[in-house]
Amino acid sequence: MYLKAGDTLLLEELLYGLMLVSGNDAALAVAHCVSGDTASFVELMNETAARLGMRHSHFSNPNGLDAGDHYSSAGDMAKLTAYALEKEAFRRIVSTTSITIGERYLANHNKLLKLYDGCLGVKTGYTKAAGRTLVSAAEREGLTLVCVTLCDGDDWNDHMALLDYGFSLCRMETAAPAGRVLASVQVRGGSSARVPLMADEDLRYPLMGEEKLTVVAETPVSVPAPVVPGQVIGKARAYLAGEEVASVDLVAAAPSARVEFQEESSIFERFFG
């Protein structure tokens, strides 16, 4: 990124320099901005890797240059990318084809942004030890796939072929769309004895071949009044081969007002008084 002493940039601007043009100076600046020094940031990197289950990775610097005890795997990079793509800011940055920051014009090194329909970008890389490395992601019909290659001299073509293959195998399955009523719950002391419960958002998960999802609604036996529409009352969980793979909140689809004691008394007197 060709930073100079005295330059002042926003953290997000440094991230553009890091992700679009592989600015090693930007990586060091981010490390100092976030953690105060490089060593503390590297410690944070390794803590995050452990939390994400990246068992074949260990980092010793923030910029990814060859160093002792600094390594990763394609699988671990895929895990990290899947986590990062959940962040809207990350998606926006890595999918940017070019940006001007002050007097700096940054053009994304990732050619797939222009070559492959639905490409979200992510990151190119090269070192003597690793060779050409590339992490890419693409989205079609709500399904996002991540592709990682290491030491690949024909990575652009390989990624397009691998992503095509992945999309031919996978589909995004909606087990329960937002708004679908999946259960009901008893309301104690309410104007309605029960209220329906619906999925707060789409319950979705990617599947391959003949795989099927099983949906289980988990609700309490009863809840106290009042109940208002949109109130979270339970969970809808999706299972694949007996393993939970996704969940969404179950919310009240209708209200149930609290019946006050005086109202209960008047009803009693109406029938028995």
Provide a role label for each language-model segment:
Residues 1-75, 84-87:
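Active-site-adjacent loops and short helices of periplasmic peptidoglycan-processing enzymes
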Residues 54-58, 66-71, 75-273:
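Domain-terminus/edge residues, biased toward the C-terminal soluble/receptor-binding domains
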